[in-house]
Amino acid sequence: MKRTLLGPVKTVLLLLLLTANGMVLAAPAVAGTAAEIDQEVGVALVKLHAAAPAAIELTKVAKGILVFPNVIKAGLVIGGQYGEGALLVEGKTVAYYNTIAASYGLQAGAQSFGYAMFLMTNEAMDYLNKSEGWEVGVGPSVVVMDEGMAKSLTSSTAKEDIYAFIFGQKGLMAGIGLQGSKITKITPGQ
């Protein structure tokens, strides 16, 4: 009797696909109105500040904070992610944005996460405001914070253009990256 690995591989892929499908369907709907986005952004910042005290310090000195409270990422060989958020200046929403990314390669699953980008310089704010769509990794330098880096960061040691914090990760998919994500200004629904 000849045995192959194809059967177990198909089973694992099917389980991953079903799990990913269930997670995407169970995930909260992408916010569509300004009020919904504002509410989700407020909740996300409270959670981020509780999880990463360094974010509180950056909030005090950042020129602007771009917050995407719920980004959905899913894929099976070909993947994508999408989320909507707001740019805050001095605690008030001044514009709305979406984040979109596509990927391909060895991947299977789905996850949701949020991220906040602290724009520390006028140049970073100008770049965001003047671009027709900003691809992360092109333009101002972005430092994605991990726990170790966040512990040593203070408002006086923050010298980069943009600091990003990823938070609230849920799901079954390896890795989160912001590189290549395109951020574009939107007009949310009423």
Please place each PLM-identified region on the residue numbering.
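C-terminal segment of classical bacterial N-terminal signal peptides
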Residues: L15-P28
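N-terminal secretory signal peptides that target proteins for export/translocation
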Residues: M1-G7
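Small-residue-enriched, tightly packed secondary-structure blocks
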Residues: A27-Q190
